[in-house]
Structure formats: structure tokens, C-alpha cells
Amino acid sequence: MRVVTIVITLLLIVSFGMLRLGDWLTPADPLPEHIDLIVTFASEQYRVNYSRELMLKYPDAHWFLSDYKNGYSRLLEKNRFDMKRVSVVDTCTSTLAEVRAAAGWIADSIPPEQIPASGSRRPYTIGLISSPYHMRRIDFMAHRYLNSPDLRYVLLPVPLGKYRWEKKTFRYWWRNEFITSITISEFVKIGYFLLTGYL
């Protein structure tokens, strides 16, 4: 009887966890008062456009843009965006590579005096931009590579409405074939990274 009770309890826990999976995969932080660096992952139209909006909102921020064959950076330049505020990398083949590249860029390009001391009320703040369903995996990776008392990162996914999604789109992720596919894919990728020690 005790074994049956344990099994039923575990099944209920797993079932509840799966029901909440979509919400868990899509964390988001509120916009901070300031941002020093905006990091855009795997550039696509919605991510680049939202990042550009944030760059206009935070005029002192720098933009670290992961682009493919410099496609979006050329469009930005064509539209007269101030490219002195943008650093482009087009060599990354994975999200993990992008996080590592951003961490390397910070280490190589930001003078130590520009990064406030530990415990400062205004830490060097990094806004991480991607699609909503990528954010939990990015959070794990950023915790591994951007976890420093002198740095603060915030998760700023492209707002759901820009994709014509709603909060319930991911809350009820099993109702839509595409959302089901990306939800399961992200869950598997997170598990893979954890199991292989990448995080």
C-alpha cells in the first residue's frame, strides 16, 4: 500500500510539473532602470527589432549582437543606426557559444573601472534578449558564465504580443503543435546540458 501511495504521489508531482512546464520555461524580469549591455541571441526579426527599441530606450547601453553572416547588422547600418554602439559576432553555432562569447567580450572589452565594485547599488547590468521559450535555458547558462558580484543580468524576452502569443499560449503548451514541439525541445536541451555538465 505504501508503494502504491508513493507511486501515485510521484505521478501527481510529475503531472503537475508538466502542466507548469510552459510557464517555467518562459521567465521574464521587469525592465531595469538602466542597462549597460544588451545581448541579442540568434538574431531574427523580432529579437533585433525589440533590442533596437531597448537601445533607443537606454541611450548609454552597448549592443552585443549575435548575427548570421552580418545580415541584421547590415540592415541596421543601412537604416543609419549608430553602429559604434554595436559589437557583432557571427561565429557562434549554439546558445552556449553565444553566452561564452558575451562573457568573453565583457572580459576583454569593458575596462575594470567601468564595472562598479561588488555590492554597488548600480552593478553592470546586462539585458539578455531572445524568444520567450529560450529564456530558462539562457538563464542556466548565464548563471554559469555571467555569475559575478560585479555583474547583474536580467532576462528580457521579446514580449509575447510581438509574436501574437499570449501568456496562456505557453501555460497550455500542449494545445498547439508548434508550441508543444518547442516546449519539449527546450526541456530536452536543458536536460542534456545538465547531464553532460555544460552548466
Positions of PLM-derived features:
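Hydrophobic membrane-insertion alpha-helices, especially the h-region
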Residues: 2-20
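A structural signal for short, hydrophobic/glycine-enriched beta-strand patches
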Residues: 23-174
